[in-house]
Every structure is written in C-alpha cells, then in structure tokens.
Swiss-Prot record:
GO terms for molecular function: structural constituent of ribosome. It comes from Prosthecochloris aestuarii (strain DSM 271 / SK 413). GO terms for biological process: translation. This is Small ribosomal subunit protein bS16. Keywords: Ribonucleoprotein, Ribosomal protein. PANTHER family: 30S RIBOSOMAL PROTEIN S16 (PTHR12919), SMALL RIBOSOMAL SUBUNIT PROTEIN BS16M (PTHR12919:SF20). The gene is rpsP. Belongs to the bacterial ribosomal protein bS16 family.
Length: 135
C-alpha cells in the first residue's frame, strides 16, 4: 500500500518536511517513491508547496494520505478542487468555487489574527493593571 506522508529533513530544531509517496512498510525517513511537495512549519507563515498533478496521480492510483498529509492537502485546497472535479463541475465553475474558497480562507485567517491580537492586548492590559496595583 502506498501512503502520502511527511519525511523529515532539515537540521536539529529546524525541521523541513518533504511530502512523499512511500510504501507504507518503509520507515519514516527511509525509502520513498517520489517527492510530491514540501512543508516548512518554521517559516512565518507556514510554507506548503505541492505538485498538484502528482498528488492527483497518486490519489488516483489508490495512495492513502496520512492524517497530517491530508490536513496539509486540505489546507492548500487540493482535496476540495479534486472533489469538485469528481462531481463533474466545469472548469469555470471550479475556478469560481476555488476563488470563493480562497476568500473564505483569507477571511478565516484574518479573523484568527484579530482574535490573537485582542488576546495579546488583553494580556498586556492585565499585566499593566497588575503592575499598577502592586505599586
């Protein structure tokens, strides 16, 4: 059975992962069939590059993505695009659906960043209030 999974590379405390198609029996960093992408979790923001054609090929021949690889494929929108193709949508519909999906993802990211900024500000305010009351 072929799996789409992550293969660790990089140096100590600075991981870079290759997204590979590999035999399920092979070790994590061992023999693989093909490199189909790259994931850099330490980059700000995280960097994911995937060869869509090769991922579609491997999924088409029955490769199973691991949960982590599947979440990365979902984050890039590849699984959503493949699902639209499978449903028989036209190319124009797929392009418009993917544009809407990109907008939803960017809105979700902006909302998450706003929440994070509010929490950070609330924490600073609480620390300032605690310091003022301590004096």
């Amino acid at each position: 059975m072929v799996k789409i999974r992550l293969r660790r590379a990089g140096r100590k405390k600075m991981p870079v992962y290759q997204i590979v198609a590999a035999d399920a029996r092979a070790p994590r960093d061992g023999k693989f069939l093909e490199v189909i992408g790259r994931y850099q979790p330490t980059a700000k923001p995280h960097s994911i590059t995937i060869d869509k054609e090769r991922v579609e090929y491997w999924l088409g021949v029955g490769a199973q993505p691991t949960t982590t690889a599947q979440s990365l494929l979902r984050a890039t929108g590849l699984l959503y695009e493949m699902n639209l193709k499978r449903k028989g949508r036209s190319e124009e519909e797929i392009v418009s659906e993917m544009a809407q999906w990109q907008e939803r993802q960017s809105a979700r990211l902006q909302k998450r960043l706003a929440v994070k900024a509010r929490r950070r500000q609330a924490k600073k305010d609480a620390q300032a209030a605690a310091a003022a009351s301590a004096e």
